[in-house]
Amino acid sequence: MRRLTRAVLAVALSIPAGAVGQAAERLSGDATRKVFEGNTVSGRYSGNNLPFSEFHHPDGRASGHNRNVANTDACWITTADAVCYYYGPTETRRTYCFTVELSGRLYVLRSRPSGRINGVATIEPGDPHGFSAGAAQWTCDGLISRAPGRSRLARR
């Protein structure tokens, strides 16, 4: 099954950006939040084909891994038209935002503002890999604290 998934992702990543854009439905930030929240987003990055898999906690944390490196402070939030992730303490924080397009069962993540495909993912219901059970605990501040209706800090 993993070989099939890798083959599907490899084909999806090889499609020219214009072709994917025409066949895909761009999701609003609210639609993206509804799909991602409480679920695991798993896929591969374009360019290097390295994996990512993150469980999106309702409180703004993203536990799991990027490029096989465990998340220790990852947070996520949606804007009007994108999903944004931030990593690290305030003084050295790295922020990445992506528009999300649905093409069949695949979610195409495009870097903002360039529009380049950053990765292709699928949604796994819930937390099938148990990322939240073994994750270190952290709080999400900054972007998440200023989001409408999302002022609650991650706790546990």
What are these regions (language model features)?
Residues V8-P16:
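Bacterial N-terminal signal peptides
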Residues G18-D73, Y85-R156:
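Lipid interaction determinants
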Residues M1-V8:
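Bacterial N-terminal signal peptides that target proteins for export
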